[in-house]
Amino acid sequence: MSPFFHYGHIAPQRVALEIKNSNLPPEDKDAYLEEMIVRRELADNFCHYEKNYDQFEGFHAWAHKTLNEHRNDEREFVYSPEEFEYSETHDDLWNAAQDEMKIKGKMHGFMRMYWAKKILEWSPSPEIAQQTAIELNDKYQIDGSCLLYTSDAADEGGS
């Protein structure tokens, strides 16, 4: 639904009301609404109020601490931004998600989280990972500019 929210084709409020009034199991309603409202709004709010939202300096202190503690960890795989863009990793699932994004302009939310976290894992630094994820996201995702999955805005410290 992200592209439809992003371009105003449907309001998140309308979707929330329809879900609330549906016959879906309560746990399904809660899961969808948590993702749509809480995480999405946290990311929007973070980007609105944090002037460095798209830079390493804009991350929360707990994220700085964790990323810096692991900055020099040995990585089994390291890829360039170009290798990421052209789906040239060892991971077939990641490559398929990247290809889907390039072809359809969209990727399922859980895959988008996996996609962004693997870019971090397989990049030489958090700064390069963030820049790569933002550039690929903004180039190929229909909703572009969505930092929900490339920032720490929706993550909790220590999780």
Regions found by a protein language model. Name each.
Residues 138-148:
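Fungal-biased detection of long, low-complexity, Ser/Thr-
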Residues 1-108:
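Gly/Thr-rich phosphate-binding loop signature of adenosyl cofactor/nucleotide-binding cores
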Residues 157-159:
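N-terminal low-complexity segments that are often proline-rich with Ser/Thr-Pro
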Residues 149-154:
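Conserved small/polar residues in nucleotide/adenosyl-binding loops
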Residues 52-53, 60-64, 70, 112-140:
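Active/binding-pocket-proximal capping segment
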